[in-house]
């Protein structure tokens, strides 16, 4: 299989989890019909897959994590903004529907988020690496993912929050 096709296929579940999470915010407010939500979701999935295609490293999940991070911090993430434009949603409407501070990490085998700068990090999606049946390999992957989040927390000036884990296994 061509490496680009393998990469795109390997990120489908992670992207779907991230898009479903963002779409729930839009659905909750009830300002959009089902067709608009589907168009938004499909557009965002396509945009993320294209954006991540050369930055997806299942063998090193932390590599490229910052590039793949979806971020709203009083400024809209450009990919979410593009998907919203495709359904005629203005940036002002989008800011009313989504949290003003949201960080969403879309990494191989894990999708996690944080709402607010001092919020807890919660896991949306988690999967074991495919083909790695050796416990030692799997343990290294888990340690690697944890260290990605630890790197983020090391730069924090306020006391760190405890992790509240919400896990959905695929």
Swiss-Prot record:
Signal peptide: none annotated. SUPFAM superfamilies: BTG domain-like. GO terms for molecular function: enzyme binding. InterPro entries: Anti_prolifrtn, BTG, BTG-like_sf. It comes from the Eukaryota. Pfam families: BTG. GO terms for cellular component: cytoplasm; nucleus. One of its GO terms (biological process) is positive regulation of endothelial cell differentiation. Anti-proliferative protein. Belongs to the BTG family. This is Protein BTG1. It comes from Gallus gallus (Chicken). The gene is BTG1.
């Amino acid at each position: 299989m061509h490496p680009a096709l393998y990469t795109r296929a390997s990120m489908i579940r992670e992207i779907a989890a991230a898009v479903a999470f963002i779409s729930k915010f839009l659905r909750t407010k009830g300002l959009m019909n089902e067709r608009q939500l589907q168009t938004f979701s499909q557009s965002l999935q396509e945009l993320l897959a294209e954006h991540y295609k050369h930055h997806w490293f299942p063998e090193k999940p932390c590599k490229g994590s910052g590039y793949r991070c979806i971020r709203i911090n009083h400024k809209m993430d450009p990919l979410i903004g593009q998907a919203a434009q495709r359904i005629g949603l203005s940036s002002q409407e989008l800011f009313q529907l989504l949290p003003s501070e949201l960080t969403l990490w879309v990494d191989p085998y894990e999708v996690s988020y944080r709402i607010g700068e001092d919020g807890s990090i919660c896991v949306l999606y988690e999967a074991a690496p495919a083909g790695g049946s050796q416990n030692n390999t799997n343990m290294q992957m888990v340690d690697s993912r944890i260290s990605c989040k630890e790197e983020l927390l090391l730069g924090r000036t306020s006391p760190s929050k405890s992790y509240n884990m919400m896990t959905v296994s695929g």
